[in-house]
């Protein structure tokens, strides 16, 4: 398929730093990429300081070659020998969608067979997941696309002020067929393969995390040590928190997945990423079936017993992001097993998805 490239993009590439000439001059013969690692934020530099989601990948995989990416949120990183490309999208669905689309249309890369591994931290439903754990999602549901009225003005029998697009009541049936990007289902066989490959991964734990987990006395899953699980993701650009919104998230995921999904993690980007990958798939630029979403628990999505949602969100009674560093570590430990397996056995996975074998 012939690809058109936007003039503005080509101008941006021409203007890329001279320190990175090779990729900028290879548009006529794009570099095949085996795996794209998608992270959402970094705190400072790519290496050597307090880490965000990207730094472990840069230092440990490693992603040792910087690649100018002026049309995106942050420059890319590449391991040329392994064929692995890493990116930071920026926080929120808008930046994620824009950055992924910019990469997908970048003429320097052939992404037609690339696997995409989204690896980031998230809030976790204590009913299903413990701090420091990792969850592979099959369903990714958008938490922004909706109608909304303030629940204080809603009818008394409404459980929420949110209603699905094109419906006038919460959770009205039938579920809209034209969902406008409200739901995405990843390839179930690929997700199961990733889970089976990584389910026995040893994850970081600490006494402070164990102490916090034990405060969730009515949530047995929240009290368990970190582990790898399967669980679905709600993506919304609003950082919400608290029991009532946690109940809404469970109902919203159940509704849009038509009872097949279970809300486990909450993050801010993944429907934006998947929307762009869906469009890029239509253009023949990527394979939408080669996408995995891994989210690790940096905090719980609701308060434990004895404190309010506001206190929990502000961290007034300990907690907050107590699992920040362990969750970053888990995203790399678990995600890298999949990335290295795919990239290291490319003759096996280039033309056949793992779950299809």
Language-model-derived ranges and their functions:
Residues 25-357:
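Accessory terminal and edge-of-domain segments that mediate assembly/interaction
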Residues 1-9:
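Bacterial N-terminal signal peptides that target proteins for export
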Residues 20-24:
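Sec/Tat signal peptide C-region and signal peptidase I cleavage site
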Residues 15-19:
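N-terminal signal peptide c-region/cleavage motif recognized by signal peptidases
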């Amino acid at each position: 398929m012939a690809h058109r490239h936007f003039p503005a993009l080509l101008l941006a590439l021409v203007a890329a730093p001279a320190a990175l000439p090779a990729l900028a001059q290879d548009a006529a013969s794009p570099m095949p990429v085996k795996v794209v690692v998608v992270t959402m934020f970094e705190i400072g530099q790519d290496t050597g300081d307090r880490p965000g989601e990207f730094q472990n990948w840069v230092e440990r995989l490693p992603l040792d070659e910087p690649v100018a990416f002026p049309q995106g949120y942050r420059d890319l990183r590449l391991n040329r020998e392994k064929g692995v490309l890493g990116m930071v999208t920026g926080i929120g669905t808008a930046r994620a969608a824009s950055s992924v689309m910019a990469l997908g249309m970048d003429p320097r890369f052939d992404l037609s067979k690339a696997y995409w591994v989204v690896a980031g931290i998230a809030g976790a439903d204590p009913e299903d997941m413990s701090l420091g754990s990792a969850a592979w999602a099959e369903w990714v549901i958008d938490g922004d696309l909706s109608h909304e009225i303030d629940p204080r003005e809603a009818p008394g029998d409404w459980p929420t002020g949110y209603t699905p697009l094109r419906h006038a009541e919460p959770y009205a049936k039938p579920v809209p067929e034209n969902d406008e990007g409200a739901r995405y289902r990843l390839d179930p066989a690929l997700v199961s393969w990733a889970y089976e490959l990584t389910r026995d991964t040893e994850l970081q734990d600490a006494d402070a995390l164990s102490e916090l987990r034990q405060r969730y006395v009515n949530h047995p899953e929240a009290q368990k040590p970190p582990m790898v699980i399967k669980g679905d993701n709600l993506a919304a650009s609003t950082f919400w928190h608290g029991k009532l919104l946690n109940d809404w998230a469970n109902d919203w995921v159940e509704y849009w997945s038509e009872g097949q999904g279970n809300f486990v993690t909450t993050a801010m980007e993944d429907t934006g990423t998947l929307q762009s990958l869906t469009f890029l798939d239509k253009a023949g630029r990527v394979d939408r079936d080669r996408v995995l979403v891994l989210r690790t628990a940096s905090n719980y999505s609701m308060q434990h017993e004895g404190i309010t949602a506001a206190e929990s969100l502000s961290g007034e009674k300990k907690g907050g992001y107590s699992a920040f560093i362990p969750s970053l570590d888990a995203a790399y430990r678990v995600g890298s097993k999949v990335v290295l397996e795919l990239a290291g056995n490319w003759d096996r996975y280039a033309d056949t998805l793992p779950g299809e074998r």
